Swiss-Prot record:
Similarity comment text for this entry: Belongs to the low molecular weight phosphotyrosine protein phosphatase family.
Protein name: Low molecular weight protein-tyrosine-phosphatase Wzb
Keywords: Exopolysaccharide synthesis, Hydrolase, Protein phosphatase
Origin organism lineage: Bacteria, Pseudomonadati, Pseudomonadota, Gammaproteobacteria, Enterobacterales
Organism: Escherichia coli (strain K12)
Main function: Dephosphorylates Wzc. Required for the extracellular polysaccharide colanic acid synthesis, probably involved in the export of colanic acid from the cell to medium. Involved in protection of cells against contact-dependent growth inhibition (CDI), probably due to the loss of a physical impediment to cell-cell contact.
Metabolic or biological pathway: Glycan metabolism; exopolysaccharide biosynthesis
GO BP annotation list: colanic acid biosynthetic process; polysaccharide biosynthetic process
Changes seen on gene knockout: No phosphorylation of Wzc. Loss of mucoid colony phenotype, greatly increased susceptibility to contact-dependent growth inhibition (CDI).
Keyword Glycosyltransferase (UniProt): no
Residues annotated as catalytic: C9 (nucleophile), R15, D115 (proton donor)
Length: 147
């Protein structure tokens, strides 16, 4: 059972906070948090990410970016990344995590979710669609696990 889930991207201001809140929407009983490999520590979510999420009735309010660490990783049963290279970086940092690190897009043909940072609103909207689809698929997989 995955009770503690960490979602990881680079800056922890666009993709991972959105994915975190989407998973929380589908599974409010789980502890879902996010962090970044190169986090903009202390920053809130990107304004465009906030706006796009709000269009889907998803709030990123109160988000505060934080840096991932080996120690932090130990607190989670499942760590979900946006890109395959993020898995590699996490496993270099903490080889013992290899068995619990997967792509956020795992159930969507191993889909990697591109970074929309400093890109157009349309890019943010497209990334939101990918995140929402993957979050739904994880929600279904997590439900199946509970049976």
């Amino acid at each position: 059972m995955f009770n503690n889930i960490l979602v990881v991207c680079v800056g922890n201001i666009c993709r991972s906070p959105t994915a975190e809140r989407l998973l929380q929407r589908y599974h409010p009983e789980l502890k879902v948090e996010s962090a970044g490999l190169g986090a903009l520590v202390g920053k809130g979510a990107d304004p465009t990410a906030i706006s796009v999420a709000a269009e889907h009735q998803l709030s990123l309010e109160g988000h505060c970016a934080r840096q991932i660490s080996r120690r932090l990783c130990r607190n989670y049963d499942l760590i979900l990344t946006m890109e395959k290279r993020h898995i590699e970086r996490l496993c270099e940092m903490a080889p013992e995590m290899r068995g619990k690190v997967m792509l956020f897009g795992h159930w969507d043909n191993e889909c990697e979710i591109p970074d929309p940072y400093r890109k157009s609103r349309e890019t943010f909207a497209a990334v939101y669609t990918l995140l929402e689809r993957s979050a739904r698929q994880w929600a279904q997989a997590l439900n199946a696990e509970q049976v």
